[in-house]
A protein has these predicted regions:
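Transmembrane beta-strands of outer-membrane beta-barrel pores
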Residues: 4, 20-22, 36, 52-54, ...
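Repeated loop/turn-to-beta-strand initiation elements of outer-membrane beta-barrel proteins
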Residues: 12, 26, 42-44, 58-59, ...
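Hydrophobic, lipid-facing positions within transmembrane beta-strands of outer-membrane proteins
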Residues: 14, 30, 46, 50, ...
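Thr-biased low-complexity repeat/linker tracts and other Thr-enriched repetitive architectures
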Residues: 28, 33, 44, 52-55, ...
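Residues on the lipid-exposed face of transmembrane beta-strands in outer-membrane beta-barrel proteins
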Residues: 162, 176, 191, 212-218, ...
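Glycine- and aromatic-enriched membrane insertion/assembly motifs of diderm outer-membrane
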Residues: 8, 15, 207-213, 222-270
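Leucine-rich solenoid repeat scaffolds
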Residues: 169-205
Length: 305
């Protein structure tokens, strides 16, 4: 049909049109349209449209549209949308979208988008996006994104992004900033690993490498990380030099207010104008330390390295 194909009730077979296909009931078979495929009830089969694919209730099979796929209830199969895939309730299979995948309730399978994946309730599977992944309740599987992953409930599996957040979890959080609200059974690997009990502590100290240093220590029950910077890696008589450092370590109590800790750190050193006097423009260093700390109060302590 050159312009449009219209079936008021159910359709079993093949619809091919230059503009739009419309089925008032359920469609079983193959639909191909230059602009849109619209099914009032269910779809089972293959649907290919240039712009929009809409199914009022359940969709099962392979659905492709250049712009958007919308399903009122459940979706299973392979769904590919140039911009958006939206399913009102439960979804399973593989969803691929240039912009975003949105599932109103649960999702089982793999969902991949250029920007955002959203699951309103639970996820079992994998979310991969360029910007962020959001699961409203529990997740069993993996989230990978270019900016952030969020799980509103508990997750079992792994979160990989610059920022990872969850209510509770069991597994891995790998990123620059990792956070959980209640409890976590697993391993956090990041520049800052935080929870409601994490103490953010200001540190001021001197040393024989960088002479004057300031840092922020993010301390949990045993493990801690330190982010900071220092000045005058060279002597005070030389021109200005500075460094940035990151350290991760473990602290244990020795006696009452006395604690011992050990950490390993990376240091980036910039010599600035000293490079004109025979010094390298920049240096990199790995440094291990053993520290003794005495807590004078809950907010003040003395550290010797």
């Amino acid at each position: 049909n050159l312009l449009g194909g219209v079936v008021l009730r159910d359709m079993n077979g093949v619809q091919i049109t230059g503009l739009a296909n419309l089925v008032g009931g359920s469609m079983r078979g193959v639909q191909i349209a230059g602009i849109s495929n619209v099914n009032g009830n269910n779809l089972s089969g293959v649907s290919i449209s240039g712009l929009v694919g809409i199914t009022g209730n359940h969709a099962q099979g392979v659905i492709f549209s250049g712009l958007t796929n919308i399903t009122g209830d459940n979706t299973s199969g392979v769904i590919i949308g140039g911009l958006l895939n939206i399913s009102g309730e439960n979804s399973s299979g593989v969803h691929l979208a240039g912009l975003a995948n949105i599932a109103g309730e649960s999702f089982n399978g793999i969902t991949t988008s250029g920007l955002l994946n959203i699951v309103g309730q639970s996820l079992r599977g994998i979310q991969i996006s360029g910007l962020g992944n959001i699961t409203g309740e529990d997740m069993h599987g993996m989230q990978i994104s270019g900016l952030g992953n969020v799980v509103g409930g508990s997750f079992t599996g792994a979160q990989l992004a610059p920022m990872n957040m969850a209510k509770s979890g069991k597994g891995l959080q790998i990123g620059l900033f990792n956070y959980y609200k209640e409890n976590f059974d697993g391993f956090q690997l990041g520049l800052v690993n935080a929870n409601p009990d994490t103490k953010a502590q200001l540190m001021l100290f001197g040393g024989n490498t960088t002479k004057l240093n300031v840092g922020a220590r993010f301390k949990n029950k045993l493990f801690y990380t330190i982010l900071g910077g220092g000045t005058h890696y060279l002597d005070f008589s030389d021109k200005f030099s500075a460094s940035l450092f990151y350290r991760a370590g473990l602290e244990l109590p020795l006696y009452k207010q006395l604690f011992i800790s050990g950490d390993l750190g990376f240091q980036h050193i910039e010599n600035f104008k000293n490079k004109d006097y025979g010094f390298p423009a920049r240096l990199y260093a790995l440094q291990a330390r053993v520290n003794l700390e005495y807590r004078l109060t809950d907010r003040l302590g003395i550290l010797v390295t």
